[in-house]
UniProtKB/Swiss-Prot annotation:
Highest classification ranks of the organism: Bacteria, Pseudomonadati, Pseudomonadota, Alphaproteobacteria, Acetobacterales
Cross-link named Pyrroloquinoline quinone (Glu-Tyr), sites: 16-20
Originating species: Gluconacetobacter diazotrophicus (strain ATCC 49037 / DSM 5601 / CCUG 37298 / CIP 103539 / LMG 7603 / PAl5)
Entry similarity comment: Belongs to the PqqA family.
Pathway assigned in UniProt: Cofactor biosynthesis; pyrroloquinoline quinone biosynthesis
Keywords: PQQ biosynthesis
Full protein name: Coenzyme PQQ synthesis protein A
Amino acid sequence: MAWTAPKITEVPLGAEINSYVCGQKK
């Protein structure tokens, strides 16, 4: 469980930051 927990939170966070940065550039 300890191994999957960080991944579950990391992926959506990374996607959110990615889309946010992309939106800021445009």
